[in-house]
Amino acid sequence: MATVTRFAPSPTGKLHVGNVRTALHNWLLAKKTGGRFLLRIDDTDAERSREEYVESIRADLQWLGLIPDGEERQSLRTELYEREFQRLVEAGRIYRAYETAQELDLKRKILLGRGLPPIYDRAALKLTEADHAAKAAAGERPHWRFLLDHDQPITWDDGIRGPQSFDPRQMSDPVIRRADGSWLYMLPSAIDDIAMGITDVLRGEDHVSNTATQIQMFTALGAEPPRFAHEALLTGSEGKLSKRLGALGMADFREQGIEPEAIVALLARLGTSDPVDAALDAAALATSFDLSRFGRAPARFDEADLHRVNAQIVHRLPYARVAHLLPQGMGEAAWEAIRPNLAHIDEARDWWNVVTGPVTAPTFDDETRAFLAQAAKTAASLDWSADPWRALTATLKDGTGRKGKALFLPLRQALTGHDHGPEMAALLPLIAQDEAVRRLSA
C-alpha cells in the first residue's frame, strides 16, 4: 500500500517553524516511497479560522516546494462528521454530558486534593432519559463525550518513540462536540484520516495522548488505525521552548533573505544526528529520510545555523534560479564571480555596485599612491579579455618587487573599496578597463 500522509493545520494563524517542520517531514515520508502528501485545512473553529491564513498556508507550502497532492477542508465535510457521529451515538460510544467548566474544574481540584488523578467520573452516564428531558426543558444543551473502552488496552508501536501503552481507565472520556454543536479536534480528525486513506500520521509529541484516544476512535469507527510517529518538539538555541519559535513565520525568513532550500535542508535533519547537507535537493532528502534516525531529545532550532546553511545554499544556486532577483545588468559571469562571497542573494546588489562604481577607496600613503599609479599604467596596456588580474599582478610583482599582501591589498582596496571580497581574478574582468584605470589613478 502506498504511503499517504497529511498536514492538517488550523487556519488560526500563519505557519511557524514547528508547523513547517511537521509539514516537511510528512512530505518527505510520503515522497520517500512515491506516496501522496495531502493538505487538510482543519477549520472547524469558525470563530478563529480566517481565509487569509488559509491562503498564507498554501503560499508558504508552495514557496517551500511542498506541493500537496490533494486538499480537503473540514468545514466542507460536516455531513460526513454528522453521519459518523450519529452512528457512534447509536452504538453507545458517544454520550451526553452537562457539567459546566466550573463544575468540572471543581471535580478536578477535589480529586487532586485527594491525591487522585483528575479523571472524569462519568457521572453523566447515570442520567436517565427523564433526566435528559428535564434538562432539555430547562434549556440545558449537552456537550458530547466519547466513551473509552476500559477493557481494551491502548498500544501502538510508535515510529519514533517505540512501543507505547496507555491504560484507558486512567484517561477521561474526551469531549468531542460542544453544546453549540461545533466540533473539537479529535473525532473529525479520525474520521478524515479514514476517509482520506491516511496510512501514516507524523506529528509532535504533544499529540501522544490524543493518539491514545484516537486509536479507540478508529476501532469504534470500524477502521484500522494508521501508523503513528511523534517527534520531539523544537526548542530555541538555548534548549528551551521559545515564544520566538512560535512567532517566526516564513515571511520573516523571506525578509531576512533566507532561501526555501535552506529551510528545507536544515529542518529535514533537525532532530537527528545526521549532518545538514546543503548539496542535497528535496528528492535526495526524501530518499534518505528515516524515522529511526530521530531521537526523543528536543530538537534545537538555531537561527545562526539557518543563516550558515543559507550561505552554503546561495553558493550553489545556478544563475537561472536567481536571475530575476539580481540587479539589472548583472549577468551569469558576475553571479558566478560574486556568489561565493554572499550569505544572502540580495547582497549581490552591493557587489554589483562595486563593479559598476563608483567606489570609495581608503586614503593611501605616498609610496602606495606611486605603486597604484604604476598599476594604472600597466592596466591601461593589458588585454582585458585575457585574465587581466593575473597579468596585472605578475607585471607589478616583477616591476616593483612587491608580493603577497603588499601587492594584492592596495590593488583590491583601490579597485573595490574593500579589504576583502570575491576573487579578484573573477571580479576584475567585470569592471570596465577604463574604469579600472580611473580607480587606480584616483
Curated annotation (Swiss-Prot):
Transmembrane regions? none
Q: What is its EC number?
A: 6.1.1.17
Motif 'HIGH' region located where?
A: 9-19
- Binding positions for ATP? K243
Show the GO MF annotations.
ATP binding; glutamate-tRNA ligase activity; tRNA binding
Its principal location?
A: cytoplasm
- The UniProt annotation puts motif 'KMSKS' region at 240-244
UniProt cross-references to Gene3D superfamilies, sorted A to Z: 1.10.10.350, HUPs
Recorded GO CC terms: cytoplasm
Q: Which UniProt keywords apply?
A: Aminoacyl-tRNA synthetase, ATP-binding, Cytoplasm, Ligase, Nucleotide-binding, Protein biosynthesis
Sum up the protein's function in the record's words: Catalyzes the attachment of glutamate to tRNA(Glu) in a two-step reaction: glutamate is first activated by ATP to form Glu-AMP and then transferred to the acceptor end of tRNA(Glu).
NCBIfam families listed in its UniProt record: gltX_bact (TIGR00464)
Similarity annotation = Belongs to the class-I aminoacyl-tRNA synthetase family. Glutamate--tRNA ligase type 1 subfamily.
Assembly and partners are described as: Monomer.
Q: What is this protein called?
A: Glutamate--tRNA ligase 1
Q: What is the lineage of its organism?
A: Bacteria, Pseudomonadati, Pseudomonadota, Alphaproteobacteria, Sphingomonadales
